[in-house]
C-alpha cells in the first residue's frame, strides 16, 4: 500500500505543471539569472520533498527508474539539470562552499586547497622527501664503504708491485754488478774518469764483515748494499737497464765468487755539481762473468783506479769470440776512452781492450730532430770565434730561452752556451754569440780575476750543435775539410816559376868564374829578372804567361823535337853569359806557344853550354816537371795573392800536386 500512496502524492505535487512547461521556480529552484536569495527556498522545498518521501519509495525509484512513466522521468531530468546549473553558478560566484565542493565533485574539477589542507600537503611532501633523502644517504654510505674497500685493495696491490719492482731492480743491479762492473767507466763534466767495481756498492762499514761473505750465490748479500747512497751517488744507474734486458741468458749462471782486493776501494770525490753518465759496454757473454787481474802495462785505466781482482771459471759451452777477435786498441785519454771488454774462449779467459762498436764515447750525443726546424746555425767563424744562428721561418718568432749551443770534439762537449730566458728571435733574423777576447771589432768586456775567458773552439774536428730544452738537436754545423789544390793556386794568370840552383857542395868541379855569375841570393836574381822583363825583348822572343798546371799537362804531350829549343824562364839568364843568352834567344822558334822546362831524359835536347865557337860549357839542369828530392836546391815560388815589403812575392802555403810523390 505504501508504494501506491507515494506515487499518488507525487503525482499530485507534479501534476499542476503541464507537459513541456517549466516548473515553478519555487518548486524546482531558480534559473541561472535568478537572485541568490530565491535559491534557498527551492533547495529547502526539494529537501522537504525528498525527506518527506519514505525511504523505501526513494530506494525503489533509484533501483527501478523504469517503473516511472516518461513524463515523470523527463521532469526529473530537467530538475536535475537546473540544480546542476544552479550549483555551477554558485561555484563561480563563490558564495557557497558547499555548492562549490558539490560542483567540483560532479564536474571533476580539482578542489582548491585551503591553508590547512595546504600545510598538510606540504608536511606530507616534506616527509616523503625526507624518507627519500634518508634512503639515498644509506645508499651513498654503502657505496663509500665499497670504494674504501677497493682503495685498500689497490693500495695493498700497489705495495706488492713496489716490492716486486724493488726486488727486480736489485736483481738487475746484481746482474750488472756480476757481469760488467769491472771496467765500467764514469765520465763527468770535468773530464775525470772513474772505474766502478763491486767495492763501490758496499758501504765502508761493511768491509770489516768481508770475511762473512758467502762463497756461493750472487757474491755478496743484498742487505750489505746501501741503495740510497747508490741512488744519490749514481742517479743514472737504472737508466740503461733496457740495454741488458734484451740479452737473454741461454744457460743458467754459474756460481761465482767476488773476491775483494786488499788494495782498497776506489776513492770518490763527491761534488754537488758533478754529473756522471754511464757508458754501456757491449756484453759478449752475460751468463758468465769471469774476470782476471788486468795487466797494468796494457791497461792505463787500471793504473788510474787501481787493480781490481775477481776470480771465476769460464763457461765451457760458450764460444762467442775466437782468438782472432782478441785485439788491443790503445787510445789516449785526451782523445778516446779506453773500455774494458771480455773475450772468452774455451781455453783461456782474458780481459782485453776492444773498441766500441756502436758508441765511441761515454757521452751520448743527442740525435738530430727528424722533423726539422726553422732554426739553423748559419756560420761558425774560426777566426773571429763566433756562432751565428738564423731563424728561417717567415712568420714565427722563436723563444731561444733555454736553448744550448754545444761544441763537440769526438762527440764530447768542450764548450757550451745557454741562451738566457726571454731571448726572442724574429723571423728572418739572426743572432750572433761572440766569444770573449776574440773579435778585433767588438769591444771586449773585462774578464773577472780567476776566471778563464769564454772562447769557442776553432778546430776543424769540432761539431757545433743547437739543442732545445728537450734535448733534441735542431741544427748541426761542421766545418768542411780544407783540401789544398795545386791547380787552384796558379789560376791568376801571373808569371810563375820555380828557380832551382844547385848548391855549391853538390858541384865541386864548377869553375870559379861561373860561380861568380850565379846570383848571390834568390832575391837578387828575382829582382834582375823583373828588370829584364820590363825592357823590350829582342827579336823573335815572346813573353809568355802560363800556369803550373797547364805547363805540366802540356809537357806530357810534347815530342822530344818540340822541347829541343825550350829554355828556362829565369835560370838560363842568370847562369850563362850575355852573349850566349842572345845566341840562344835567336834560336828560339817563333811558333812556341808555351814556355816549358827542359826534360833531362830527352837525348836530343839543346846543350845549354855550347856557343857559336863550339866551346863546351857547364850544363845547367832545370827540372820543373817533377821535384827531384835527391838534389839540393833552392826553390822560389811566386803568386799574386801576397807580397813582402821587399817586393818579393811568396806563397801562403806550399803548392801540393798529385805528382809530388811520383818520379818520372
From Swiss-Prot:
In this chain, composition skew of type Polar residues spans: 245-260, 312-325
Domain LTD, residue spans: 362-481
Q: Where is the composition biased (Low complexity)?
A: 286-298
Compositionally biased tracts (Basic residues):
533-547
Tell me the Gene3D superfamilies matching this sequence: Lamin Tail domain
Region feature (Disordered): 1-40, 245-272, 286-329, 504-563
Going by the UniProt record, its keywords in alphabetical order are: Coiled coil
InterPro entries tied to this protein: Lamin_tail_dom (IPR001322), Lamin_tail_dom_sf (IPR036415), Lamin_tail_domain (IPR052877)
GO BP annotations listed: positive regulation of mRNA splicing, via spliceosome
Coiled coil regions, renumbered to chain: 118-169
Q: What is this protein called?
A: Lamin tail domain-containing protein 2
Which organism does this record belong to?
Mus musculus (Mouse)
Q: Which gene encodes it?
A: Lmntd2
Amino acid at each position: 500500500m505504501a508504494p501506491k500512496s507515494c506515487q499518488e502524492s507525487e503525482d499530485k505535487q507534479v501534476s499542476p505543471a503541464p507537459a513541456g512547461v517549466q516548473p515553478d521556480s519555487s518548486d524546482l529552484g531558480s534559473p541561472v539569472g535568478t537572485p541568490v536569495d530565491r535559491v534557498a527556498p527551492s533547495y529547502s522545498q526539494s529537501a522537504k520533498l525528498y525527506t518527506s518521501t519514505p525511504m523505501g519509495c526513494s530506494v525503489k525509484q533509484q533501483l527501478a527508474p523504469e517503473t516511472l512513466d516518461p513524463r515523470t522521468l523527463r521532469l526529473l531530468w530537467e530538475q536535475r539539470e537546473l540544480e546542476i546549473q544552479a550549483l555551477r553558478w554558485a561555484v563561480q560566484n563563490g558564495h557557497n562552499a558547499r555548492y562549490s565542493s558539490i560542483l567540483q565533485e560532479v564536474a571533476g574539477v580539482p578542489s582548491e586547497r585551503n591553508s590547512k589542507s595546504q600545510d598538510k600537503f606540504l608536511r606530507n611532501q616534506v616527509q616523503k622527501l625526507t624518507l627519500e633523502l634518508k634512503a639515498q644517504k644509506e645508499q651513498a654510505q654503502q657505496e663509500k664503504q665499497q670504494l674504501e674497500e677497493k682503495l685498500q685493495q689497490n693500495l695493498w696491490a700497489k705495495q706488492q708491485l713496489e716490492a716486486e719492482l724493488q726486488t727486480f731492480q736489485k736483481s738487475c743491479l746484481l746482474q750488472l754488478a756480476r757481469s760488467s762492473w769491472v771496467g765500467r767507466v764514469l765520465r763527468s763534466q770535468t773530464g775525470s774518469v772513474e772505474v766502478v767495481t763491486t767495492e763501490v756498492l758496499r758501504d765502508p762499514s761493511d768491509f770489516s764483515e768481508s770475511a762473512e761473505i758467502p762463497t756461493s750465490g750472487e757474491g755478496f748479500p743484498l742487505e750489505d748494499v746501501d741503495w740510497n747512497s747508490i741512488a744519490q751517488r749514481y742517479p743514472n744507474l737504472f737508466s740503461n737497464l733496457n740495454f741488458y734486458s734484451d740479452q737473454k741468458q741461454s744457460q743458467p749462471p754459474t756460481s761465482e765468487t767476488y773476491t775483494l782486493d786488499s788494495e782498497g776501494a776506489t776513492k770518490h770525490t763527491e761534488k754537488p755539481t758533478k754529473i756522471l753518465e754511464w757508458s754501456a759496454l757491449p756484453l759478449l757473454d752475460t751468463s758468465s762473468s769471469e774476470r782476471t787481474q788486468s795487466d797494468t802495462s796494457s791497461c792505463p785505466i787500471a793504473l788510474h783506479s787501481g787493480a781490481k781482482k775477481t776470480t771465476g771459471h769460464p763457461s765451457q759451452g760458450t764460444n762467442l769470440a775466437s782468438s782472432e777477435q782478441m785485439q788491443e786498441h790503445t787510445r789516449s785519454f785526451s782523445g778516446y776512452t779506453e773500455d774494458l771488454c771480455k773475450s772468452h774462449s774455451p781455453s783461456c779467459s782474458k780481459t782485453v781492450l776492444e773498441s766500441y762498436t756502436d758508441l765511441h764515447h761515454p757521452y751520448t750525443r743527442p740525435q738530430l730532430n727528424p722533423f726539422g726546424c726553422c732554426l739553423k746555425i748559419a756560420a761558425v767563424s774560426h777566426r773571429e770565434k763566433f756562432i751565428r744562428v738564423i731563424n728561417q721561418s717567415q712568420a714565427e718568432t722563436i723563444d731561444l730561452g733555454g736553448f744550448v749551443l754545444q761544441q763537440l770534439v769526438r762527440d764530447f762537449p768542450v764548450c757550451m752556451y745557454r741562451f738566457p730566458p726571454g731571448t726572442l728571435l724574429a723571423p728572418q733574423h739572426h743572432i750572433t754569440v761572440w766569444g770573449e777576447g776574440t773579435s778585433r771589432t767588438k769591444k771586449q768586456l773585462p774578464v773577472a780575476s780567476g776566471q778563464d775567458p769564454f772562447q769557442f773552439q776553432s778546430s776543424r774536428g769540432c761539431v757545433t750543435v743547437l739543442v732545445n730544452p728537450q734535448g733534441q738537436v735542431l741544427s748541426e754545423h761542421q766545418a768542411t775539410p780544407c783540401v789544398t789544390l795545386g791547380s787552384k793556386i796558379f789560376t791568376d794568370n801571373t808569371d810563375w816559376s820555380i828557380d832551382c840552383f844547385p848548391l855549391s857542395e853538390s858541384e865541386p868541379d864548377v869553375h870559379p868564374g861561373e860561380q861568380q855569375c850565379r846570383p848571390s841570393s834568390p832575391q837578387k836574381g828575382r829582382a834582375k829578372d823583373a828588370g829584364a822583363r820590363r825592357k823590350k825583348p829582342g827579336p823573335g822572343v815572346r813573353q809568355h804567361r802560363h800556369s803550373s798546371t797547364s805547363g805540366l799537362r802540356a809537357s806530357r804531350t810534347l815530342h822530344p823535337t818540340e822541347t829541343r829549343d825550350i829554355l828556362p824562364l829565369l835560370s838560363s839568364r842568370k847562369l850563362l853569359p850575355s852573349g850566349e843568352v842572345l845566341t840562344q834567344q835567336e834560336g828560339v822558334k817563333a811558333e812556341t806557344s808555351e814556355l816549358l822546362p827542359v826534360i833531362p831524359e830527352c837525348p836530343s835536347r839543346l846543350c845549354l853550354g855550347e856557343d857559336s865557337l863550339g866551346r863546351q860549357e857547364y850544363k845547367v839542369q832545370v827540372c820543373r816537371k817533377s821535384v827531384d828530392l835527391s838534389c839540393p836546391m833552392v826553390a822560389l815560388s811566386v803568386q799574386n795573392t801576397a807580397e813582402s815589403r821587399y817586393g818579393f812575392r811568396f806563397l801562403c802555403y806550399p803548392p801540393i800536386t798529385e805528382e809530388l810523390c811520383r818520379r818520372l
